[in-house]
Amino acid sequence: MFKTSVFGYIIIIFIIVVCLKIYQESDAFQLKCIVSKVDGNKYCVRERAKLELAADLLATVTQKMKKVVKHMGDTFPDRDNVKRLVKNFRPEKVSETLPTSEFTAYSENKGEKLAFCVNTTKKGNKLIDENTLTFVALHELSHIMTESVGHKDEFWNNFRFLIDEAQKIKVYTPEDYKLRPKEYCGMTINDNPHYDN
């Protein structure tokens, strides 16, 4: 009987440890979710002195992404890549990347979730400017509308297409990052397909 109860306690402790580990690695532990004044939606952001500014930046860029996706769907409704974008974009699933994330931004499963670093450096708290984050968001939207995985020609064509359309509707102002590179979450953006021949 003693062996059975000891074994039971060991199993219970193991389950508790596993649950705590899962919780600590989850968004709920490392991000704080707050409602943005920009659009009234909830955004999960890293703990920092001014949570509202980070949530509002994500909300502003999300509004821009919604405008681009709507424009694409209205203007090019018969294109397969646009159909994918319209179908898979989930504006309610936008958040900040976890502090432990190896990626500066990512699209999970082609649109189920979008996450962005909103800082100029990996460890700092200085927020990135809205136009640069919009460029990164267009990059992630391009992954959603691209059937292939990675950065193949299909992706770059879609990215250039989105940038051009975002410029037309005044959502994004193209910047030549080769001439004026930008720091984004510890990396340097030094190319913009809008300026490629």
What does each of the following model-derived ranges do?
Residues M1-Y9:
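Feature marks short, highly hydrophobic, charge-poor N-terminal signal-anchor/signal peptide-like helices
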Residues C44-R46:
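An acidic/histidine-cluster motif and surrounding catalytic segment
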Residues F135-E147:
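Active-site recognition of the HExxH zinc-binding catalytic motif
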Residues D129-F135:
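Alpha-helical scaffolds flanking conserved acidic
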Residues I13-Q24, L31-V35, D39, R48-I128, ...:
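Metalloprotease/metallohydrolase-associated module, dominated by Zn2+-dependent proteases
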